Amino acid sequence: DDTLSGFRLARLEVFNWGTFDSRVWTLQLDGKNGLLTGDIGSGKSTLVDAITTLLVPANRIAYNKAAGADSKERTLRSYVLGHYKSERNEVTGAAKPVSLRDPNSYSVILGVFHNAGYDQTVTLAQVFWMKDTQGQPARFFLGAERGLSIASDFAHFGSDIAQLRKKLRGLGAELHDSFPPYAAWFRRRFGIE
């Protein structure tokens, strides 16, 4: 069936991304259209931003654009730490974000794309962690020519990101430390020139 050819998002998973905290949250699309609805602040833009992060280089991303927000309102750091409100210091008057997670946690966003016309599956993922208390998170990029999931493939590695990398390589995944080789990898698989 030619209507099913081409890669389509089959499943989106997020772990410790924005306010999606402490467990794997899954959006199962199976290559079909989906509709994100909900109240203001319910996470619609957060999920769109996860997909954008998987596919677009960091220097081209404007987070929370779907909600029409100020470009400084959300950052990769705010998503990884789970900033959900600001508290004002009564002495200085300065606002400080309040986080769901401490800097010792890690975050994963994962998309499984399937081309039913050719029976091909590709998983793209990014893993984030804080190397220091300031600045943006560290990350690595993953591509695999099969379906992976956060619960089974990105867990049970202790707290050492190097062990997670080793585990994922053992599953046949390609790991990259920057966006350009990762993008080249997925563009080849998706047939994007």
Where are these regions (language model features)?
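Extreme N-terminal "head/tail" segments of very large remodeling/mechanoenzyme assemblies
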Residues: D1-E193
